[in-house]
Every structure is written in C-alpha cells, then in structure tokens.
Curated annotation (Swiss-Prot):
This is RAC-alpha serine/threonine-protein kinase. Changing residue 179 to A: In kinase dead mutant; lacks kinase activity. Overexpression inhibits insulin-stimulated translocation of SLC2A4/GLUT4 in a dominant negative manner. Changing residue 434 to N: Does not affect caspase-3 cleavage. The record marks 462 as: Cleavage. Changing residue 308 to A: Does not affect ubiquitination by ZNRF1. PROSITE patterns: AGC_KINASE_CTER, PH_DOMAIN, PROTEIN_KINASE_ATP, PROTEIN_KINASE_DOM, PROTEIN_KINASE_ST. One of its GO terms (cellular component) is mitochondrion. Its EC number is 2.7.11.1. The gene is Akt1. Three specific sites, one in the kinase domain (Thr-308) and the two other ones in the C-terminal regulatory region (Ser-473 and Tyr-474), need to be phosphorylated for its full activation. Residues 409-480 form the AGC-kinase C-terminal domain. Belongs to the protein kinase superfamily. AGC Ser/Thr protein kinase family. RAC subfamily. It comes from Mus musculus.
Length: 480
C-alpha cells in the first residue's frame, strides 16, 4: 500500500453538529479518505496525532449551497441506515471549488480501489457475479418484496431524510420497523452515489443484540429498510414502570449492550453514536435489541440563531458538544448514561434549559445515590469521564477495558453472546405477534398510514428507471 499523502490542507469554517455555531478548523485531506481538523495548524508530527475532528470522505456525497452562508459545502454519508452530514464554509467560490474537487477526486479514487478489490474477490473483472453470488448466499427472495405486503400501523419517527413506520407483514403477522429514505437525498441528481456499500454492511451484520435487517427494497423514489421490531417493549417503558433496576438486572442489560457495541466497533468499524434508553428494546425472551431506527432530526431553519439545537441533548458526550473528534468512546459515554439511569432512576445530568444542561455535561461532577455499590460507582465514574481519552473504554482496548471492569467480574462474555444467561425479567408475551407492550392507541384499531406517496404502490418500476441502485433487493435467509 502506498504511503498516505496529504492531498489538500487549509482553513475551513465547520458548523457544529449540535450547537450550531461556526468554528474555524485547519483541515487536512489525505488520499486514504481521512479528513481531519485541528484548532491550530499542526506544526509537527506530535500535534498531528490529536485532531479535533476526524472524518472520512469515502462514499460521500458532496453538495454546494449558499445557505446558511455563502460558499458552503456539505459532505453527506450514509452510516448504517442513518444519513450523517457535516457542513463547512470558505471565503470564496474558488476556494470551495478547490476543496470540492479534491474531496471528489479522493472519494472517486477510493471507489475505484474498492471496485477493483470486489472484482478480484469475485474472480470476475467484468460482470456482477460477485453481487449475484452474495444475493444467492443470502437466500435470494422468490419474489420482489413491495410496500403492499405490509399494513402500516404507526409512525415511529420522522426526520429530514425520511420516516420510520411500525408495519405488520400481512403474510406472517410479524411486526417490523420500516425505515423509508428519500432517494434524492442520497443520490445527487447528476451522479451515482456510493450508497449501498452500507446496505451490504447491514446485510452481513449478524449479532444477537442488534436489530437485524429483514428486507431492503426500493420504489421509484424511496429506499426501504425493513428491520426487526422486538415486541418485549422498550426498556424505557419497563424502567419508568419500575423506576429503578437492581444492579444485577442493569449488569445483565449492560453486558448485552457491551457485547453488541464491541461487535460494531471491532468487526464493523462503526460507531453507533445514538445510544439512549429509547433505542433499547427487549425481545420476547427479555434479551436486549439495540434498534437502528434513528433518523437525523428535522433540520433547523436557515438563519436560525446559533443557540438552535438538534438531537437528544441529555445523552450527548462532552466531546460531541464541543464538536471535537468523537470516536468509539462516545458510545461508552452513552452506555454510562443508560446504566446510570437504570441503577439510579434518573439521568446523570438534566436541566430543561439546554444551555444549563450543556454546562452540566461539560463541567459538573457526577453524583451517586448512597445506595449504589462501590463497583457500580467505579464503573459509572469510568464511563462518564469527561475526557474521552481518560474514559473507561477510551483506550486502544476499547470494549475489553469495560469487560474487565470488576462490576462485570462474574460475567462470562462468550455466554453473554450465546444468550446462555437467564434474562432477569421475561416479558409477558406469548409470541412474536403479541402486542401487549405496544401503545394501545394503535393496536386497538387498525390505523392505515398510507405509504409516503400514493404512487409508491407502483413498485414494479422497470429497472431502467433505477440505474443508481442495482442489487438493492435483499431478503434475510431463514426465519427472522
């Protein structure tokens, strides 16, 4: 492999993801897709070791806009099934053009490299046999899945790029979450985006505590991901009913979450980013399922004040608020917050006023109820360290650090993965179609949410109309 070289460097203004202020950053773009930003221009190798921002432009889509400031450009990527955006601006159109060209050139180069590797792997340089084989090995669907095969029950979430709907598969009576993304968001009008590599990542992901992808398909203007929807209820629901969990019960859930995050970090090189109580569900046996129904929240209006905020602020790690680089350690902060909630019955930092809340997250020392045991205190203190490099799990060992903590001393991690531990609570459901933990308002009566556009029922769009998205239909093998 060639040495990694800097393709372009210079000052950019980067817009904060959560606190929407513009911050000057000195960015380096490298030919391996790394795009890293610093507060000051790095003078030596040591300074280069610790960037504030660390992104990749691989498989990104680039957009230029004159709002909220002139000469703005946005880098958009699909991570997992969630659309992520980074916003920058420069002083002149020429400068923006230079950055855009450099970023596009690097992204295209990486795409070519990946295609060559794919061809090499499938042993055929010219055709799509690699992709075909992949579909076959995943039990190629006997028919194309369409939107008409589901009943639409409830809107679970809505965002800038699409929506998530609770659906029931007519043929089986099983419940799924269908995530529907607008195609135009992901594919630039005049270029083919490199979107579906992520789809492949999802398809190949198998972990007992992660929501599995059951189907993915497309209509003429949407991409649809159909994912498991565990029916043992949200952990949030069970915790609010019981107010607090015992340390043993929290340990069980914590261990399953650690197992799933370890898999994402080490096997998939993905940071989950969105760990919070609402994203944790129980399956019918009482095991954890981490959902992937996340959507970017509605974007703020152009020209809104700097104080505008987007997202769930209570769970944000200090480094995210400061818009510094956040790597895997951000997930361990999230684990700290949800485990604190489970064992203490409240959030570690809370204030209705966002400004005050941010200050607490950044400055306030963590406090514990007197009833909490020393191991639990030690674990939570480690996970909720403000500095991600000092945080438990923040080092190179990642999840292994947490697994070795004395709070988890009696846990056999292979047994966790193999679901050999007995869940401390078994939901009172009789089958996968039992809806007792769903909101009564939508299980009592059949609500029909029409698919996003009436004409979405025109599934069988001929393939010429979807040149951007070859090989998008997917069906998981075996039972869900």
């Amino acid at each position: 492999m060639n040495d990694v070289a800097i393709v372009k460097e210079g000052w950019l203004h980067k817009r904060g993801e959560y606190i929407k202020t513009w911050r000057p950053r000195y960015f380096l773009l490298k030919n391996d897709g790394t795009f890293i930003g610093y507060k000051e221009r790095p003078q030596d190798v040591d300074q280069r070791e610790s960037p504030l921002n660390n992104f990749s432009v691989a498989q990104c889509q680039l957009m230029k806009t004159e709002r909220p400031r002139p000469n703005t450009f946005i880098i958009r990527c699909l991570q997992w099934t969630t659309v992520i955006e980074r916003t920058f601006h420069v002083e002149t159109p020429e400068e923006r053009e230079e950055w855009a060209t450099a970023i596009q050139t690097v992204a295209d180069g990486l795409k070519r490299q990946e295609e060559e590797t794919m061809d090499f792997r499938s042993g055929s340089p010219s055709d799509n046999s690699g992709a075909e084989e992949m579909e076959v090995s995943l039990a190629k669907p006997k028919h194309r899945v369409t939107m008409n095969e589901f009943e639409y029950l409830k809107l679970l979430g809505k965002g800038t790029f699409g929506k998530v709907i609770l659906v029931k598969e007519k043929a089986t009576g099983r419940y799924y979450a269908m995530k529907i993304l607008k195609k135009e968001v992901i594919v630039a009008k005049d270029e083919v985006a490199h979107t579906l590599t992520e789809n492949r990542v999802l398809q190949n992901s198998r972990h007992p505590f992660l929501t599995a992808l059951k189907y993915s398909f497309q209509t003429h203007d949407r991409l649809c991901f159909v994912m498991e929807y565990a029916n043992g209820g949200e952990l949030f629901f069970h915790l609010s009913r019981e107010r607090v969990f015992s340390e043993d019960r929290a340990r069980f859930y914590g261990a399953e979450i650690v197992s799933a995050l370890d898999y994402l970090h080490s096997e998939k090189n993905v940071v989950y980013r969105d760990l919070k109580l609402e994203n944790l569900m129980l399956d019918k046996d009482g095991h954890i399922k981490i959902t992937d129904f996340g959507l970017c929240k509605e974007g703020i209006k152009d020209g809104a004040t700097m104080k505008t905020f987007c997202g769930t602020p209570e769970y944000l790690a200090p480094e995210v608020l400061e818009d510094n680089d956040y790597g895997r350690a951000v997930d361990w902060w999230g684990l700290g917050v949800v485990m604190y909630e489970m064992m203490c019955g409240r959030l570690p930092f809370y204030n209705q006023d966002h400004e005050k809340l941010f200050e607490l997250i950044l400055m306030e020392e963590i406090r514990f109820p007197r009833t909490l045991g020393p191991e639990a205190k030690s674990l939570l203190s480690g996970l909720l360290k403000k500095d991600p490099t000092q945080r438990l799990g923040g080092g190179s060992e990642d999840a292994k650090e947490i697994m070795q903590h004395r709070f988890f001393a009696n846990i056999v991690w292979q047994d966790v993965y193999e679901k050999k531990l007995s869940p401390p609570f078994k939901p009172q459901v009789t089958s996968e179609t039992d809806t007792r933990y769903f909101d009564e308002e939508f299980t009592a009566q059949m609500i029909t949410i029409t698919p996003p556009d009436q004409d979405d029922s025109m599934e069988c769009v001929d393939s010429e109309r979807r040149p951007h998205f070859p090989q998008f239909s997917y069906s998981a093998s075996g039972t869900a």
